[in-house]
UniProtKB/Swiss-Prot annotation:
Keywords: Carbohydrate metabolism, Cellulose degradation, Glycoprotein, Glycosidase, Hydrolase, Polysaccharide degradation, Secreted. It catalyses: Hydrolysis of terminal, non-reducing beta-D-glucosyl residues with release of beta-D-glucose. The active site is at 225. PROSITE patterns: GLYCOSYL_HYDROL_F3, PA14. This is Probable beta-glucosidase I. The gene is bglI. GO terms for molecular function: beta-glucosidase activity. Pathway: Glycan metabolism; cellulose degradation. Gene3D superfamilies: Galactose-binding domain-like, Glycoside hydrolase family 3 C-terminal domain, Glycoside hydrolase, family 3, N-terminal domain, Immunoglobulins. It is found in: Secreted. GO terms for cellular component: extracellular region. One of its GO terms (biological process) is cellulose catabolic process. Belongs to the glycosyl hydrolase 3 family.
Length: 839
């Protein structure tokens, strides 16, 4: 279609058409006006891959490492490449808009979506978000910065009031958005669910209009988070352009009435529509047809990029006695619950059906030239493992039949609406549609055959947003239809997992029937949570095994093994949108397993997968420790590349790992209490707190070792002359450093530039990260690198009395760090205190 003449189109639109354009028509699409050639636009999650339009039975996609993993790369060029591939993935899914990146701030290790954001530091997070967005938009696809702002916990996320000082709001929580905008003016911004200082962000004029649009000069489209609109006139007047998803709750006839009664001025309505039409023009060059089919790419070059990203994200936490890299020629024992599980992404909006996955065991097995043995050690599932992949259909296919009916199972002569073949026994039905379904209330029979490999008692579990009963050979084993209890699955809208058990015989085939009723059939109290459409289901099973038996077997094998690697950590069950973790600990039994293995084999390598910090009570015992995050499709290969030395680890922690949860500055203020959460740590988030109170964490922000060694030398600073007021350039300061690879293997060094302020009018952090760069060096190679920072950004704090940034006069110390202990120091002066606003 030709580009729209926006102003002419606004004149030609009726009020009804304008109103329609300001709300989605379904979960993933905007409204169209065919008579004026205004097309519908498609959008898709999100943070670590482009899922497409279906949670349920969707088209597979590339899964990138989670955001904290990408944050650990500290690599803007890599993030730019990843953004470009995300753009291409979006086009393949027929999507004009990607709902990401996420750049909230991890004020606590417990945040359910902490893995979705890059870092606890605004400079690192903002620059990486800027470059990934730049890559996305270079492909013509619109990127969406989210969640604007202070959506830093899941507990009562739609109702909680985040009470935060203006200084902390500016210096910590808005800063990553501000810095990302300086690199890439994203086409879209998504508002947060929560309130900030008393007002929901989606109707907060100060945040949307005064700061984002006027102060920062941004002119894109502001959309709500899903069901995160809470008013008609207030939201429109504050600057919320688009309510998502459809069908609308707050616009439609209510908005038309508000305009006709001057609760919303017509020129304000036109502003909202103008931003929608400008977005249509922004993505016009994609030439994606309406209702485009969703396709898969999965090209060899994409797989190579995903593998490189997974390997670059791995952080070498410890490597005493050079235990790593391992020897491919030697035999190896692989232990642990994450060994044969592909923990490739977190849960919620970030989850997707990956093209393929590689488990750590598969990655190690592919590279080892010696014998590879396995021992489970412990299981770490929160809910019972999915039963679907263990089932067979009547004709021998893996999986089960999925039969949809309008009528309850008790009714005779039910009409079969649709039959599907599924493998996963976890389904979120919010985007499942069939024209024969009469309402949100319908029923599904899922049938398959289960043949156990071992005798024993088997536990079965059912979690639903709705109701569910599980039968084995006609016997009711699990009933989750009455007296339901609130759980955490499916964005916090599901029941807890109800369980039952049955003794089964190896080799005998049993008929499994799971009968599901959609969300309206539930008696669960869902106040305070979002129930997405028809709801969802999950059913699983596992043979009951004693933990001591598993650990003892692993310990015995470890005592005899030539090389041992233990894979433990979290999965999307433990870290997910919808709820926060209750603690920082690994799943039950994991710490005991690791500790006992280290007792008999001190050279065992420990690999932890999680998107956010975990406690490690055995950390002093281990000589070799890797942190591997949720690594995407190529997770297992990326880890194995580092374990065996094909890739020299270069990752640095983007978040602080405290010794214990109580050490974290948000410990006493991390949940909603009486409808609010107090950001009591103020600007002292993450490393800013630990350094201010001189409290040693387990592993600090920026930590990460290498298989080689580096030196940094010859620090010089080049400054520009001061002017009476800061101009747009911000008076650049260029730091030049010589970096030398003094070891025997090639590797990448991350050079970090920190600025320590002089004594000023207010308390400030000891030092703050202001810039960084990554450089690859062959053994013995030396390179000069430059880091450019703006004086106004490097020196300023937010003055609440003046409501401006303050760059106070004085001498500022520059500290340059990297791998190892060495610190280079220099300084520069600010001759005169200056105040400023803007981007």
């Amino acid at each position: 279609m030709p580009r729209l003449d926006v102003e002419k189109t606004i004149e030609e639109l009726s009020l009804g058409e304008k109103v329609a354009l300001t709300a989605g028509i379904d979960f993933w699409h905007t409204a169209s006006v065919p008579r004026l050639n205004i097309p519908t636009l498609r959008m898709s999650d999100g943070p670590n891959g482009v899922r497409g339009t279906r949670f349920f039975n969707g088209v597979p996609a590339a899964c990138f490492p989670c955001a904290t993993a990408l944050g650990a790369t500290w690599d803007t060029e890599l993030l730019h490449e990843i953004g470009q591939l995300m753009g291409e993935e979006s086009i393949a899914k027929g999507s004009h808009i990607i709902l990401g990146p996420t750049i909230n701030t991890q004020r606590s290790p417990l945040g359910g979506r902490g893995f979705e954001s890059f870092a606890e530091d605004g400079v690192l997070s903002g620059l990486l978000a800027g470059y990934i967005s730049k890559g996305i938009q270079e492909k013509g696809v619109a990127a969406t910065l989210k969640h604007f702002v202070c959506n830093d916990q899941e507990h009562q996320r739609m109702a909680v009031d985040s009470i935060v000082t203006q200084r902390a709001l500016r210096e910590i929580y808005l800063l990553p958005f501000q810095l990302a905008m300086r690199i890439c003016r994203t086409a879209c911004v998504m508002t947060a669910y929560n309130k900030v200082n008393g007002t929901h962000v989606s109707q907060n004029k100060e945040i949307i209009t005064d700061i984002l649009r006027k102060e920062w000069g941004w002119d894109g489209l502001v959309m709500s988070d899903w069901f995160g609109t809470y008013s008609t006139s207030d939201a429109i007047n504050a600057g919320l352009d688009l309510e998502m998803p459809g069908k609308t709750r707050w616009r439609g006839t209510a908005l038309a009435h508000a305009v006709s009664s001057n609760e919303v001025a017509e020129f304000v309505m036109d502003e909202r529509v103008r931003n929608v039409l400008n977005l249509v023009n922004f993505v016009d060059g994609l030439n994606i047809p309406e209702n485009a089919p969703e396709k898969a790419l999965n090209r060899p070059q994409d797989q190579a990029l995903l593998r490189r990203a997974a390997a670059e994200s791995v952080v070498l936490m410890k490597n005493e006695e050079d235990i790593l890299p391992l020897k491919k020629e030697k035999s190896i024992l692989v232990i642990g619950p994450n060994s044969k599980v592909a923990a490739y992404c977190g849960g919620g909006s970030a989850s997707l059906d990956a093209y393929y996955t590689v488990t750590p065991f598969e990655g190690v097995s592919a590279q080892s030239k010696g014998e590879v043995k396995f021992s489970q050690g412990v299981y770490s599932h929160k809910d019972l493992p999915l039963l679907g992949p263990l089932l067979k259909t009547a004709d021998g296919k893996t999986g089960f039949s999925f039969k949809v009916y309008n009528e309850h199972p008790s009714e005779s002569n039910r009409e079969l609406i649709e039959q599907l073949h599924l493998v996963s026994s976890s389904g979120f039905l919010m985007d499942y549609v069939n024209p024969k379904i009469k309402s949100l209330t319908y029923y599904v029979d899922m049938e398959g055959l289960f043949t156990p490999e071992e005798d024993g008692v088997y536990d079965f579990g059912v979690t639903v947003v709705g109701t569910g009963q599980l039968f084995i050979d006609g016997e009711l084993v699990v009933d989750n239809t009455k007296n339901q209890r609130q759980g955490s699955a499916f964005f916090g809208s599901a029941t807890v997992e109800e369980k039952g058990s049955k003794e089964l015989k190896a080799g005998q085939t049993y008929k499994v029937l799971f009968q599901f009723g959609t969300a309206p059939t539930s008696d669960l109290d869902t106040r305070g949570v979002v129930v997405f459409g028809p709801g969802g289901f999950r059913f699983g099973a596992s043979r009951r095994v004693g933990q001591e038996e598993l650990i003892s077997n692993a310990v015995k094998l470890a005592s005899e093994a030539e090389q041992v690697v233990v894979f433990a950590g979290l999965t999307s069950e433990w870290e997910t949108e919808g709820y926060d973790r209750d603690h920082m600990d690994l799943p039950p039994g994991s710490d005991e397993m690791i500790s006992r293995v280290l007792d008999v084999n001190p050279n065992a390598v420990v690999v932890i997968q999680s998107g956010t910090p975990v406690t490690m009570p055995w950390a002093n015992k281990t000589k070799a420790l890797l942190h591997a995050w949720f690594g995407g499709n190529e997770c297992g290969n990326g880890i194995a590349d580092v374990l065996y030395g094909d890739v020299n680890p270069s990752g640095k922690l983007p978040i602080t790992f405290p010794v214990r949860l109580q050490d974290n500055p948000s410990y006493v203020n991390f949940r909603s209490e009486r409808g609010r959460v107090l950001y009591g740590e103020d600007v002292y988030v993450g490393y800013r707190y630990y350094e201010k109170v001189d409290l040693a964490p387990l592993f600090p922000f920026g930590h990460g070792l290498s298989y080689t060694t580096f030196t940094r030398s010859d620090l010089t600073l080049t400054t520009t002359p001061e002017k009476p007021q800061y101009e747009e350039s911000g008076e650049p300061i260029t730091a030049t450093v010589t970096v030398t690879n003094t070891g025997k293997v090639a590797g990448a060094e991350i050079v970090q530039l920190w600025v320590a302020p002089p004594a000023t009018e207010v308390n400030r952090p000891v030092r703050e990260l202001k810039g960084f760069t990554k450089v690859f060096l062959q053994p013995g190679e030396q390179k000069k690198v430059e880091i450019v920072v703006e004086k106004k950004l490097a020196t300023s704090w937010f003055d609440e009395m003046r409501e401006k940034w303050a760059s106070e006069k004085g001498e500022y110390e520059v500290l340059v760090t990297g791998t190892g202990e060495g610190v280079l120091k220099s300084s520069f002066k600010v001759e005169k205190t200056r105040y400023w606003l803007g981007l």
